[in-house]
């Protein structure tokens, strides 16, 4: 005798579970866009990232001219680790720099530095 089993009762709850998990998971591009927006906010914030004090950034008001213009960043720094290191503590690479060590001095958190890098890589 051959036993026959119906898979329909199992498939419906399994499908519902899979759909609910997929619906609850945040979308990758939405998270990335959120980080870029937060990075832009920090870069333009005169009290936090304050990139505009020294750098020209597209869309920023009253930019400084001490540092280089922040454009074509992804082509200049294809490895984001390099840019993270610069923001964290540029004095390790260039002891004569006037760039503040944002990470070492705890001006910015690691998460904030990464958000700014996400933003800069869109320029």
Where are these regions (language model features)?
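Cys/His-enriched microdomains
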Residues: 49
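Electrostatic cytochrome c docking/interface patches
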Residues: 26-46
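N-terminal export/targeting leaders of redox proteins
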Residues: 1-33
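C-terminal capping alpha-helices of c-type cytochrome domains
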Residues: 81, 86, 92, 104-123
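Positions in alpha-helical segments
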Residues: 37, 68, 97-101
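N-terminal alpha-helical segment
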Residues: 35, 62-66, 95
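Extended, non-globular alpha-helical segments
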Residues: 1-12, 82-101
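Gly/Gly-Pro-rich "capping" loops immediately C-terminal to redox-active cysteine motifs
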Residues: 44, 52-88, 104
């Amino acid at each position: 005798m051959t036993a026959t089993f119906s898979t329909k009762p199992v498939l419906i709850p399994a499908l519902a579970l899979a759909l609910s998990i997929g619906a609850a998971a945040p979308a990758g591009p939405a998270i990335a866009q959120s980080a870029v927006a937060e990075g832009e906010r920090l870069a333009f914030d005169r009290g936090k990232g304050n990139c505009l004090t020294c750098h020209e950034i597209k869309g920023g008001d009253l930019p400084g001219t001490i540092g280089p213009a922040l454009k074509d960043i992804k082509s200049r720094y294809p490895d984001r680790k390099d840019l993270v290191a610069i923001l964290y503590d540029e004095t390790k690479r260039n002891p004569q720099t006037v760039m503040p060590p944002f990470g070492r001095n705890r001006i910015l958190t690691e998460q904030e530095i990464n958000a700014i890098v996400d933003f800069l890589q869109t320029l």
